[in-house]
């Protein structure tokens, strides 16, 4: 089950109490105080684990508490520190206290101290003085800290697929990567984001995210809009997946409406580097003219794929992706326009190289 938001209560351990005890030795009637200090309470840490991409493990487990410190012992023996609580989260997890962002956990294997355990109490050996040789007092340990926090997951991927429902994003990610999403010929088949690893060759690859289809008004929360859109905020490059076979909504209109939703949600998201994939091109007769016309619509001075050793079937690249172009393109310029068919795998092999080159 994919879960991207959950509330939990975290608490550090209480410090152990100090000990009240006195030295007992043969021929010593009243030995001095030798009560040890209590152990410190356990700390709470968040740790990033690359092997998980959901917060589902937190469902049904609301309280996460470190152990209390042990009491001090006799003969000045200190109590054992309470066991720390390590809370494992996927990369991209944000921790909120109320509406305020407290922690942003991104780096693999990153471990961050969230709550410090309570200090252990001092044993009675600390309270001996010239006027009080037999102190019968020891400190209690300090209480731990408790917080109610909200965990929000924003997936981290190199490429984010953006498109309307039934555009073929799930089929594409299942064809090009190791992801196995549910696929069917109706809208909203995908109800949760999917992550897939795309292997280009033995040394190269990237992570791709397929978010559920965007509908108009998604930026205002329609459908599950905002909860979906947040998952592509961290992606490096966006790939708009357009359905070239649609008769009721042309590819230009699809692109404009998708871009409008991104702009409404976040200007930073709308300004990310992007490319366009014209899916289902194998059932469109005039795909060549459609692709050229769309490139002109984007003001893309593109060049055909076969000029750069890729498959000689239609697709166009921004010169930025070639070795003979040294300057960076305009941020609003498409990096590529590539017709493909996720079902028949047409141009999918070329797509791997195009996406790899598009990454900064």
Curated annotation (Swiss-Prot):
InterPro entries hit by this protein: G_OBG (IPR031167), GTP-bd (IPR006073), GTP-bd_Obg/CgtA (IPR014100), GTP1-OBG_CS (IPR006074), GTP1_OBG_dom (IPR006169), GTP1_OBG_dom_sf (IPR036726), OBG_GTPase (IPR045086), P-loop_NTPase (IPR027417)
CDD domains found in the cross-reference section: Obg (cd01898)
EC number: 3.6.5.-
Source species, domain of life: Bacteria
Cofactors that this protein relies on: Mg(2+)
Residue ranges occupied by any Obg domain in the UniProt entry: 1-156
UniProt protein name: GTPase Obg
UniProt organism field: Helicobacter pylori (strain ATCC 700392 / 26695) (Campylobacter pylori)
